[in-house]
Swiss-Prot record:
Belongs to the methyltransferase superfamily. METTL16/RlmF family. One of its GO terms (cellular component) is cytoplasm. Specifically methylates the adenine in position 1618 of 23S rRNA. It is found in: Cytoplasm. This is Ribosomal RNA large subunit methyltransferase F. Disulfide bonds: none annotated. The gene is rlmF. Keywords: Cytoplasm, Methyltransferase, rRNA processing, S-adenosyl-L-methionine, Transferase. It comes from Cytophaga hutchinsonii (strain ATCC 33406 / DSM 1761 / CIP 103989 / NBRC 15051 / NCIMB 9469 / D465).
Length: 322
């Protein structure tokens, strides 16, 4: 009888990048072998598949710990209560797409090694983008955040994992309205900047969005969110929402045009894409790219832009990517 209820799943998650380690379904046996604590959260669902309760913050946290240890060599990873526990496959996809983007500046040869420097705007308490980027490509990272608790948490993750020490630096942004100012030092160079910007425009919007997410997971209306699930205010919302945040980033990027080869950001809301294009058109970068991304039923995209001409890109690569 169980076989009749067995749901057919695709062998791979085709919407994820070909280099993404998470294209196949989670191998819970392998993950439990790496992190035995995960076993208590793994059950068989109605389709007779191993899974966890994604509504349970402790289960999601333990799954992330197992994924980061099994695939990325991170022995110690935790986040403060109430902070965002990100989906690892989607975060990995951003990194792999950025690697391909950097390759376009070097005859499609993806750059690897610590000479490649990436700036993560809004690194968060979880420090996941630097973890993945350093493991997959050997890049060095600077992670910036406006929240002192997030900064302390990210620093703690770096300090507790030797593979990150010397490769990841965490900086506090002391001026919450600034993006690059106060973070990029004089004469400092970054090969790429990445960002997963706050989505919502207010605390109320963020709370409503969290309830919608939980309702979708539970397939029923949820009226109260678990504090562990949604994330802190600076992770989820800012004045003006995603559109305003990206607008400020684009404006500041012009001032740092010579400091960064490529700028990039995720755009979750389709309607914000044209606003970003319009803003970029005013500043006239040399090149603008849009890269579609998706996981499951969720679609998003990242946009990237550079003020460097092809000749300038070639000089940049020749001087730095050795």
């Amino acid at each position: 009888m169980a076989e009749k209820n067995k749901k057919e799943h695709p062998v791979t998650k085709d919407r994820l990048h070909p280099r993404n380690k998470h294209r196949e379904r989670y191998d819970f046996d392998a993950l439990i072998a790496t992190t035995p604590e995960l076993a208590q959260y793994v059950t068989l669902n109605i389709y007779n598949d191993q899974s966890i309760d994604f509504f349970n913050p402790a289960a999601v946290l333990c799954l992330n710990q197992a994924l980061l240890k099994h695939y990325y060599g991170i022995d110690e990873w935790n986040i403060p209560e109430g902070y965002l526990c990100p989906p690892i496959p989607g975060r990995a996809d951003y990194i792999h797409n950025i690697a391909a983007l950097l390759g376009t500046s070097a005859n499609d040869v993806i750059p690897v090694g610590p000479a490649i420097k990436c700036l993560d705007i809004g690194v968060g308490a979880n420090c996941v983008y630097p973890i993945i980027g350093n493991n997959e490509y050997g890049w060095s990272f600077v992670g910036a955040d406006v929240d002192p608790v997030s900064v302390a948490s990210a620093k703690n993750i770096v300090d507790k994992n030797k593979v990150l020490q010397g490769n990841v630096e965490i900086r506090l942004q002391n001026h919450p309205l600034d993006i690059f100012y106060g973070i990029i030092g004089e004469g400092e160079r970054f090969d790429v900047t990445i960002c997963n910007p706050p989505f919502h425009a207010s605390a109320e919007d963020a709370a409503a969005g969290t309830l919608r997410k939980l309702s979708n997971l539970q397939h029923k209306k949820v009226t109260k969110a678990n504090l562990n699930f949604g994330g802190q205010h600076n992770e989820l919302w800012c004045e003006g929402g995603e559109s305003a945040f990206v607008r400020e980033m684009i404006l500041e990027s012009k001032k740092f045009a010579a400091s960064c080869l490529w700028f990039s950001t995720l755009i979750s809301k389709q309607t914000n894409l044209q606003k970003a294009y319009d803003q970029l058109e005013v500043l006239a970068p040399f090149d603008v790219r849009t890269i579609p991304m998706g996981q499951g039923n969720k679609s998003s995209r990242l946009i990237a832009w550079t003020f460097q001409s092809k000749e300038a890109q070639a000089k940049w690569v020749s001087a730095r990517w050795k």
